[in-house]
From Swiss-Prot:
Location of the protein in the cell: Plastid, Chloroplast
Transmembrane segments: none
PROSITE patterns: CYTOCHROME_P450
Pfam families: p450
Name of the protein: Carotene epsilon-monooxygenase, chloroplastic
EC annotation from Swiss-Prot or TrEMBL: 1.14.14.158
Length: 539
């Protein structure tokens, strides 16, 4: 997915802010969501534990410090400064950060500043400004995203810059060709989706509730392991140290993005702070596992004298991306290859799992849409598994997924850092080093951009038209980002979601467990705080 992976939405410098008059849009009415904000008064949940990060800094202390540091600061950008309230701090520090960003968009307009002591962020909720920033690489680099995820990605292309990024992207993109996707649909996407349905049978038989967010996360981890390096995590069936390490590393990246103080930049502290010691052990295990897979695959490629002989080369025994990259005989170190694969592992796993979670949630709340989706599956597939050529015929399911990604984009924000002074559309000035937070969530939910923006309406996208993307919507729809650093795996991710949802809906009915409060929190994607519990039954 888009390589701004780990909660670019929440930064290590989030804080409270002082207000200035604005000359932008007047406040708009708040949208009504079926999901409750994590800043609402909590109600009983199915689980008592919350995944929401807790800061050791109290909101009152943070407010006082920030206002003291920010007061009197010169600002010639022409960008208004948002004024946060204490209730917003919980979401700024480890919660659903995109919710207060959305609230302030309605108050201050499509661009505003969050001042955080010596550092501040420009929040962008306007498609034209987003287009300008995303298309103008290398004027705008990854910045904060690279800082919080380098411990895991190393020099992987997800966070690489300059010539290294150009070289690695050129090496990776050819591996995602049409023939590869057609093979993976049958051998991996369908098989893993069938395995998921199989694992849901006990729940269908006894009527007990199942956390579908967790199940989709497990399934997509299995998919990405097989697709990338022909490695079966088998996380739907078993637990293993490698699986635990993957989730530990993902959690650490999310926590780093919300830590007020980036203490993990100090090597000495990383050796004694328990959280950092655990994260380092996890990353070491993941890297050793991937390095071992690379070494074994390289040995096979060398022994067989394998070499790519056409643009859509696929090894029949092992169609993985790793096999393609090694057979290309490109001069690249095992460490660089490892970092590139880890970039794709994290991006491909986190995003698709969240897309499926929220799509199923939305369908469960809309019986008409759910019925249409199942009718399409029955008509197109006629009881069999989807093949590559069937995907283009699953038009309504595709639009349901598109609409889900509009309402719940992954990631909900993208971060860039200005490398040179620039003037944004609207004549707003930014200086070198300015961090810019593009709120995909705001753009996708803005009533200035979309009619009935808060409603789940798959039909808003022409079912017989082109699949919506940043180009044909003029950056109004950017779930995979846009510009030169757009997600390289957008087709892979969309096809995986279509196949998984089709297989699921073909075999099972689904019902949302009533009376559960589904709160949101920010990570690499939009998570629930306590899971998404549903009941499934055989069709």
């Amino acid at each position: 997915m888009e390589s701004s992976l780990f909660s670019p939405s929440s930064s290590s410098y989030s804080s409270l802010f002082t207000a200035k008059p604005t000359r932008l849009l007047s406040p708009k009415p708040k949208f009504t969501f079926s999901i409750r904000s994590s800043i609402e008064k909590p109600k009983p949940k199915l689980e008592t534990n919350s995944s929401k990060s807790q800061s050791w800094v109290s909101p009152d202390w943070l407010t006082t410090l920030t206002r003291t540091l920010s007061s009197g600061k010169n600002d010639e950008s022409g960008i208004p400064i948002a004024n946060a309230k204490l209730d917003d701090v919980a979401d700024l520090l480890g919660g659903a950060l995109f919710l207060p960003l959305y609230k302030w968009m309605n108050e201050y307009g499509p661009i505003y500043r969050l001042a955080a002591g010596p550092r501040n962020f420009v929040i962008v909720s306007d498609p034209a400004i987003a287009k300008h920033v995303l298309r103008n690489y290398p004027k705008y680099a990854k910045g904060l995203v690279a800082e919080v995820s380098e411990f895991l990605f190393g020099s992987g292309f997800a966070i690489a810059e300059g010539p290294l990024w150009t070289a690695r992207r050129r090496a990776v993109v050819p591996s995602l060709h049409r023939r590869y996707l057609s093979v993976i649909v049958e051998r991996v996407f369908c098989k893993c989706a069938e395995r998921l349905v199989e694992k849901l049978q006990p729940y269908a038989e006894d009527g007990s509730a199942v956390n579908m967010e967790a199940k989709f996360s497990q399934m997509t981890l299995d998919v990405i392991g097989l697709s990338l390096f022909n490695y079966n995590f088998d996380s739907l069936t078993t637990d293993s140290p490698v699986i635990e390490a993957v989730y530990t590393a993902l959690k650490e990246a999310e926590l780093r993005s919300t830590d007020l103080l980036p203490y993990w930049k100090i090597d000495a502290l990383c050796k004694i702070v328990p959280r950092q010691v655990k994260a380092e052990k996890a990353v070491t295990l993941i890297r050793e596992t991937v390095e071992d897979l690379i070494a074994k695959c390289k040995e096979i490629v060398e022994r067989e004298g394998e070499r790519i002989n056409d643009e859509e080369y696929v090894n029949d025994a092992d169609p993985s991306i790793l096999r393609f990259l090694l057979a290309s005989r490109e001069e690249v170190s095992s460490v660089q290859l490892r970092d590139d694969l880890l970039s794709m592992l994290v991006a491909g796993h986190e995003t698709t799992g969240s897309v499926l979670t929220w799509t199923l949630y939305l369908l469960s709340k809309n019986s008409s849409a759910l019925r249409k989706a199942q009718e399409e599956v029955d008509r197109v597939l006629e009881g069999r598994n989807p093949a590559f050529e069937d995907i283009k015929e699953l038009k309504y399911i595709t639009r349901c997924i598109n609409e889900s990604m509009r309402l719940y984009p992954h990631p909900p924000v993208l971060i860039r850092r200005a490398q040179v002074p620039d003037i944004l559309p609207g004549n707003y000035k930014v200086n070198t080093g300015q961090d810019i937070m593009i709120s995909v969530y705001n753009i996708h939910r803005s009533s200035e951009v979309w009619e009935k923006a808060e409603e789940f309406l798959p039909e808003r996208f022409d079912i017989d038209g082109a699949i919506p993307n940043e180009t044909n919507t003029d950056f109004k729809f950017i779930p995979f980002s846009g510009g030169p650093r757009k997600c390289v795996g957008d087709q892979f991710a969309l096809m995986e979601a279509i196949v998984a949802l089709a297989v699921f809906l073909q075999r099972l009915n689904v019902e949302l467990v009533p009376d559960q409060t589904i709160s949101m929190t920010t990570g690499a994607t939009i998570h629930t705080t306590n899971g998404l519990y549903m009941k499934v039954s055989q069709r």
